[in-house]
């Protein structure tokens, strides 16, 4: 009876260790993905790049990211691209073509479609709206 109890406890502890390792592996993958996407989102827009770098399948990466953030990998990449585009539109005089190039788009038209799909406005409309707001704030 004592041996059986000991084996049950050993089995229980080994399962807890495996679960802990799985959790920490998922946390590690999520941290590594975050570091990779923060460094590479301007050039790399595809899930396959990040999965390859992490040596895991795209599906596994998608599950880990969704479980950890509530968002898809593509959503995270797109949010970072939009945030960077807004920053460049508001703080530089770069052309839309130059911004498109900096953000890894092959042409300005593709970037404009992407920006409008994600913000509801064209890049130039966004920039013009900011300039109007700045001008209004100066008049107050």
Model-derived segments and spans:
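Core residues of bacterial helix-turn-helix
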Residues: 54, 103-104, 115
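Short hydrophobic/aromatic patch on the recognition helix
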Residues: 61, 110-111, 115
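Amphipathic alpha-helical segments enriched in hydrophobic/aromatic residues interleaved with Lys/Arg
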Residues: 1-2, 35
